[in-house]
């Protein structure tokens, strides 16, 4: 009897143990199945964008691109659609050789040239004589500076021919007429120093400066009014000199220097009152600072000069030859750093900016030099 009871208990224990083992296996299988389902559920969230992770039902229940769409059913705030704004057009750089150049230009000074006509011919030129090409981005910003007094007739011809030419050259430029006030002796180089400073006050972006006499008009638009690695002399073949360079060191008429080149030579001399000498002094400054003159081909650098009598109060400077010999010393103290003047008026005209200045008066001839 006891053996029978013992055998029965043994079978019962084995059965209970088997059931416990079976229960454990089922629990383990269910655990891993639930874990796999949770893992798959959360992996779907991790692959969505942050907006979808925060609002998983927004993309399917709300059409935010429609003005009358609503998110009330989902309980989410309405979000306006993010429409791409207009992109600014990419303006390419201006070509080295502008495509609209015509080459040789016929220049004549016989027909009347009213300023109103010149203004009608140049509708793209802004107030103050500023212009920038609409279809390309120039590499330089050019200030054209004209020393001036009592030459309104010449200025109208200059504006008539130069504005169309500069626009064909795809320049970003401004024209500044530096008008010497009063009837004291004329001082061309000092007016050019004033023009350099006043142009930079208006626009610090100027990095190229063209210094032009008002009575000189280029005969070829391939004579590009730009600055290069060396100072540039543009007017190398004037009709006045038989379309030849008068002498090797001549730097008169029309010239161009970058801002860095101009500052390197301390600008132009201020003490050349009257006609002559300042161009040769400028040439000496360029040579003494280790730079060389760059010039266009003689067939391109041709100019016509408007014939006129010599201006009153612009007599030849009797001290000019002595001064030229002393450039090495005088350029250290006489130049852009020592120029003194007073601006009387700044007037922005349709085709140019007129700056009237008082530049003082010369010392007596006995104390000059």
Curated annotation (Swiss-Prot):
GO molecular function: beta-N-acetylglucosaminylglycopeptide beta-1,4-galactosyltransferase activity; lactose synthase activity; metal ion binding; N-acetyllactosamine synthase activity
Disulfide cross-links: 94-136, 208-227
Domain of life, source organism: Eukaryota
EC code: 2.4.1.-, 2.4.1.38, 2.4.1.22, 2.4.1.90
Binding residues for Mn(2+): 215, 308
Membrane topology, record value: Single-pass type II membrane protein
Keywords, ordered alphabetically: Disulfide bond, Glycoprotein, Glycosyltransferase, Golgi apparatus, Manganese, Membrane, Metal-binding, Signal-anchor, Transferase, Transmembrane, Transmembrane helix
Record-level GO BP terms: brain development; carbohydrate metabolic process; cerebellar Purkinje cell layer development; locomotory behavior; memory; protein glycosylation; visual learning
Cellular compartment(s): Golgi apparatus, Golgi stack membrane
Annotated Polar residues bias: 58-73
Residues binding UDP-alpha-D-galactose: 147-151, 186-188, 214-215, 275, 308-310
Matching InterPro entries: Galactosyl_T, Galactosyl_T_C, Galactosyl_T_N, Nucleotide-diphossugar_trans
Residue positions binding N-acetyl-D-glucosamine: 277-280, 320
Catalytic reaction equation(s): D-glucose + UDP-alpha-D-galactose = lactose + UDP + H(+); an N-acetyl-beta-D-glucosaminyl derivative + UDP-alpha-D-galactose = a beta-D-galactosyl-(1->4)-N-acetyl-beta-D-glucosaminyl derivative + UDP + H(+); N-acetyl-D-glucosamine + UDP-alpha-D-galactose = beta-D-galactosyl-(1->4)-N-acetyl-D-glucosamine + UDP + H(+)
Transferase as UniProt keyword: yes
Glycosylation site residues: 63, 68, 354
The UniProt record lists the keyword Manganese: yes
Task of the protein: Responsible for the synthesis of complex-type N-linked oligosaccharides in many glycoproteins as well as the carbohydrate moieties of glycolipids. Can produce lactose.
Protein name: Beta-1,4-galactosyltransferase 2
Organism: Mus musculus
Encoding gene per record: B4galt2
